[in-house]
Regions:
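A short, surface-exposed loop/turn module that caps and links secondary-structure elements
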Residues: 43-70
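Short, hydrophobic secondary-structure boundary micro-motifs
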Residues: 30, 52-56, 100
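Arg/Lys-rich, positively charged N-terminal/basic patches that mediate binding to nucleic acids
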Residues: 1-36, 40
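Enriched for short, Lys/Arg-rich terminal
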Residues: 69-103
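Short alpha-helical
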Residues: 12, 28, 39, 62, ...
Length: 103
């Protein structure tokens, strides 16, 4: 099992989305979002190659893969499998212009 490093931008994404779900759907949904993100990341530590290879041209996503957050199927966790760890790059809604968000 590889250690996981959550980049600051990814942590902010996660907390911002949890806050949004808290406000729009209630605290239970916000908490479930955090739990499902954490469960997805934990699975990546065991199966780092399980995500889909991303095809964006943005350099921040070079070498990245993505998985969907279970129960929140439009939310993507972008990560980079490295020999020594899994690096979580961003957690973003799939309907957004991903490359624009990264600029």
């Amino acid at each position: 099992m590889l250690p996981v490093f959550l980049r600051p931008a990814a942590r902010k994404d996660q907390l911002d989305m949890a806050e949004y779900y808290d406000a729009e759907a209630g605290e239970a949904v916000g908490n479930r979002f955090i739990r499902e993100c954490d469960a997805g990341v934990e699975r990546l530590s065991r199966f780092p190659e399980s995500g889909t290879i991303v095809r964006y041209k943005h350099p921040k996503l070079e070498g990245c893969r993505s998985i969907l957050v279970p129960g929140f199927e439009k939310i993507l966790i972008f990560y980079r499998p490295l020999p020594e760890r899994i690096e979580i790059v961003r957690i973003l809604h799939g309907a957004r212009d991903i490359e624009w968000v990264l600029n």
